[in-house]
Amino acid sequence: MYSFVSEETGTLIVNSVLLFFAFVVFLLVTLAILTALRLCAYCCNIVNVSLVKPTVYVYSRVKNLNSSEGVPDLLV
């Protein structure tokens, strides 16, 4: 039978296609990891803004009120 391409050329084409698909999979995995990290940072920011900052604000506010009035630090 006649062959349209030689064995070496066919192997090169197949290897090139496989390398291209491997690169695409690598890019997809990298993008998925970066997206997950970005989502994690976003969620950590929500926790910081909604829980940590108000707690620190209330703590410092009560401490300032107690120190200015001469009341012992019972609330802190």
Curated annotation (Swiss-Prot):
PROSITE patterns: COV_E
One GO term (biological process): viral budding from Golgi membrane
Sequence intervals crossing the membrane: 17-37
Domain of life: Viruses
InterPro entries associated with the record: E_protein_bCoV (IPR043506), E_protein_CoV (IPR003873), E_SARS-CoV-2 (IPR044377)
Membrane topology recorded in Swiss-Prot or TrEMBL: Single-pass type III membrane protein
Keyword Signal among record annotations: no
Intravirion side: 38-76
Pfam families, sorted: CoV_E
Keyword annotations of the record: Apoptosis, Host Golgi apparatus, Host membrane, Membrane, Transmembrane, Transmembrane helix
Localization annotation: Host Golgi apparatus membrane
Virion surface membrane side: 1-16
GO CC terms, sorted: host cell Golgi membrane; membrane
Keyword Membrane included in the entry's annotation: yes
Disulfides per UniProt: none
Subunit structure: Homopentamer. Interacts with membrane protein M in the budding compartment of the host cell, which is located between endoplasmic reticulum and the Golgi complex. Interacts with Nucleoprotein.
Similarity section: Belongs to the betacoronaviruses E protein family.
Miscellaneous section: Bat coronavirus 279/2005 is highly similar to SARS-CoV (SARS-like).
Cross-referenced HAMAP family: BETA_CORONA_E
Stated role: Plays a central role in virus morphogenesis and assembly. Acts as a viroporin and self-assembles in host membranes forming pentameric protein-lipid pores that allow ion transport. Also plays a role in the induction of apoptosis.
Protein name (database record): Envelope small membrane protein
Organism of derivation: Bat coronavirus 279/2005
Gene it is expressed from: E
